[in-house]
Amino acid sequence: CGKSSAEAGLQDKLTGALIGLARTCQTAVPTAQTYRVILEGLFTTVTNVNFNTETTQVMIDKVHAESASLSDSPADDYDMSGLWNADEDIRSLKSLILFGMRGMAAYAYHALMLGKSSDELGAFFIKGLSALSEDWGMDELLPIVMETGKVNLTCMALLDEANTSTYGTPVPTTVPLTIEKGPFIVVTGHDLKDMERLLQQTEGKGINVYTHGEMLPSH
């Protein structure tokens, strides 16, 4: 929401680099590291996740390095102006695919942090990113849009399995709204593993930890 124009431009470059990596994977064999790089890269471009241009540039370099590790002739980065300046119907369909994958990558990344991954998801990220670079019409793009929704359900099931197998099945819980005296940390997002680590690190130190937004289920 509040990123600078410089950061917005870099996030487009990062997305273009990810599309190039996906296209490289069409002729090379992706690895578990490839999957992780794709997740990290897409997650970086989710709204309000990153505002730091240096961090984004590091991620771009990481994507390029992964492409180079897979092939002596990796695919070129995709120029995102080709998507943003396309016919409005094509732009809308490709945007649905892109934004759907960005959200899905966040969930898949959290699942991966808890030791859960899916070959089906990895294959779709490559397929979906590659589709963004194709000069396709509505008939070719609509099935990819529908598949994005279907695979998203698979991703949500994977995250649910990762969370419940690690922390148990959620039950209705009373959440206190009291603001305690003393230093505090507010945590948002979906990363329960980060919350667990933070609670361990602050235990007995007089630091209060509060949840915000999507972190409510941690209770």
Give the label of every model feature segment.
Residues C1-H219:
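Metallocofactor- and cofactor-centric catalytic cores in central/energy metabolism, strongly enriched
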